[in-house]
């Protein structure tokens, strides 16, 4: 019987090669667990899984994953994950107090078919931070961690502008 997946909450954080916090010094991304974090992880990228049996993973899935890991998982796989971003252009601090139930910034990550594994959502970011740039940073870090591209809502593309201006593209 398949166990219910454990959802980890936390934040994404860039890893830098030195003390400078410049885009050119980013060497990777890591997930920092935190009980109130806006990022939810149901399954880390396959190349990040190091434990034996994952919470929620059936015996069949575990055996299939171990077989695949012995073949090639040490490197990042292109096009295994895909993302969708439903963006907002202003943060909570720029939103009127009279605005009822303002929408949140959302990024969803989905794993495509891999081996015997069915496609499934593996992570998401959902928040309306005071500074909208925090949503951009969390989303870009998620995209980098999962090595994936994103589809953007056509009318809310400020995350794209932010990524270009900060040389993530």
Where are these regions (language model features)?
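RNase H-like, metal-dependent nuclease domains and their acidic two-metal-ion catalytic environment used
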Residues: 1-169
